[in-house]
């Protein structure tokens, strides 16, 4: 078994930072296609967000602001860039904050963290997070399945 999840984990730090900041302007530009983000980031030139200083200058969106935006513009406050037909689940975190779960195999990126913690394909992951409106159970399950693991909640009763 490889020691690392993929080659991204063994990149030279300077290369990693260069690649991350090269993508950051694309991420900011995509966020600004949502009306809530466009308003929050008004005056920001996405193409200029290419350094730590530029990142630090972006306005912070606080959890309380998200909750207020979602009350004003349900369900996502104008912050969602995922098309409605691409949303697998509508989840709710404490706040309350409503969150869309997209349709990707490991939407939350949890497989990488599980791998770093020593979880490997074929392992059984005991997932004791809730599966109600909160995302915890779904987040762990998607990462376990992306790694090729069974999570305890998906196993048939013996």
Task: For the regions a language model picked out, list residue spans one by one.
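Nucleotide 5′-phosphate-binding alpha/beta core
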Residues: 1-116, 120-122
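Conserved AMP-binding loop of ANL adenylate-forming enzymes
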Residues: 116-147, 151
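ATP-dependent adenylate-forming carboxylate-activation enzymes
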Residues: 151-158
């Amino acid at each position: 078994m490889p020691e690392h999840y993929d080659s991204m984990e063994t990149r030279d730090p300077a290369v990693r930072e260069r690649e991350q900041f090269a993508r950051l302007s694309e991420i900011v530009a995509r966020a600004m296609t949502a009306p809530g983000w466009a308003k929050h980031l008004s005056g920001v030139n996405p193409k200029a967000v290419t350094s730590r200083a530029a990142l630090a200058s972006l306005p912070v969106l606080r959890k309380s602001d998200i909750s207020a935006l979602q009350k004003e513009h349900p369900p996502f406050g104008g912050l969602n860039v995922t098309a409605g037909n691409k949303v697998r689940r509508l989840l709710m975190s404490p706040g309350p904050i409503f969150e869309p779960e997209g349709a990707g195999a490991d939407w939350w990126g949890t497989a990488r963290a599980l791998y770093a913690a020593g979880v490997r394909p074929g392992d059984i992951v005991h997932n004791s997070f809730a599966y109600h409106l909160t995302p915890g159970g779904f987040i762990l399950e998607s990462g376990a399945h992306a790694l090729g693991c069974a999570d305890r909640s998906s196993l048939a009763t013996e």
